Amino acid sequence: MDVVNQLVAGGQFRVVKEPLGFVKVLQWVFAIFAFATCGSYTGELRLSVECANKTESALNIEVEFEYPFRLHQVYFDAPSCVKGGTTKIFLVGDYSSSAEFFVTVAVFAFLYSMGALATYIFLQNKYRENNKGPMMDFLATAVFAFMWLVSSSAWAKGLSDVKMATDPENIIKEMPMCRQTGNTCKELRDPVTSGLNTSVVFGFLNLVLWVGNLWFVFKETGWAAPFMRAPPGAPEKQPAPGDAYGDAGYGQGPGGYGPQDSYGPQGGYQPDYGQPASGGGGYGPQGDYGQQGYGQQGAPTSFSNQM
């Protein structure tokens, strides 16, 4: 009991509410319906043979058949209408292969769904370890989807043949006494095959479930990551018109307005306003505008002379 309690306490039951676990529950339930409706079937048909000699007639002949539908082994006794004798009439066909294949796939799908669901709940860490669990789950799901397609299609064809072989009208056509003049053969009851029809429906529903579950298992494998495109990034912001002068702004390094050593550290116009060119710019303590001027090479000596 302690082990059971620990498993229950450590179980991640929320996975049942997620698509991966919820679909697995549906697969488990639908697999039960598929093999139960087919594997437990028992059918019966009735017919009558009325001979010219009324005393030899059989007015209620019951013929039973069941899964796995080896109809060639099913027979019934019918009056031969000749001197009180009877004749064994065998049904035609062996449809056990398609029926047994369908039931086998359903049973294994039931067992796998139950095991996978238990793994999702109680062994989630082991399931995701090294990504082997999702990959094996995906391959198994793909195989079962294919097997459901094949088995359901084969059983649908087999069921059609079973209906033909158990139709009282077709059986009567093969009975020799019914072809004799004076004898009358009638069908009294057709077999009820609604349960078998339901099994075919559940087979194709299982096919839909297993094919649909491929996507949810595929996402768990991580194989979808290369195909998942990242959302486009935000467009690059264009600089505002005011930023054309540079990021530094006024008076802050290159690109700004500021007084960067007058107009440059070397050459060009250097307003020294009262100091020699080698002493740097500025107003300086030596005189006013008229002293030293711009320089010594043929330029005006002061602002007053230029005026």
Swiss-Prot record:
It comes from the Eukaryota. Residues 249-298 are annotated as: Repeats, Gly-rich. Residues 233-307 are annotated as: Disordered. The chain crosses the membrane at residues 20-43, 102-125, 133-156, 195-218. The modification Phosphothreonine is found at T221. Ubiquitinated; mediated by SIAH1 or SIAH2 and leading to its subsequent proteasomal degradation. Phosphorylated by SRC. It is a multi-pass membrane protein. InterPro entries: Marvel, Synaptophysin/porin. Residues 259-276 have a biased composition (Low complexity). One of its GO terms (biological process) is modulation of chemical synaptic transmission. The keyword Nucleotide-binding does not apply. Expressed in the brain with expression in the cerebrum and the cerebellum. Residues 1-19, 126-132, 219-307 are cytoplasmic. Residues 248-258, 277-296 have a biased composition (Gly residues). Glycans are attached at N53. This is Synaptophysin. It comes from Rattus norvegicus. The gene is Syp.
